[in-house]
């Protein structure tokens, strides 16, 4: 049995070792600059504005997050309330909600690429007739083994964009150890559809 301590494999891709990082100072100038750089593309904000208007009007709004382990909450303690998805939901609720009218769907499953995301979207997000108003898609790490080289990712994006209630879509490019991701491969999809894109690089 090979020694795999501290390493993960995915379709022949060997992930870099997980290095312990220092705590981030959320009030530092470096952190502020990183956040400023994170918006790769503002895109067409029409659908997002509609979601915000709906929330401010007191109507029920559903935010959905689909992706891999980062969306699931890997590294967050506790996993369900300290993950980026829940933090984004809380911030949206605080800034735009009226009377707890914002709902939350977290469909993150570790190790899954957008190929499975296509199937999981129906099962994990649209279950029981859900109609999310905003969908964040995060597969920038797990799609390394995607033999379609981004076609499944684009198919998932198109699937969400074509839903009859026209949800807003945001593409999130999270990172693995050593600040690695596939945003160079996947960002053309966001540019093609003029979508908001956020990078953690």
Regions found by a protein language model. Name each.
Residues 1-66, 71-79, 90, 94-101, ...:
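N-terminal secretory targeting modules
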Residues 56-59, 82-201:
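Alpha-helical cap/lid subdomain in secreted, periplasmic
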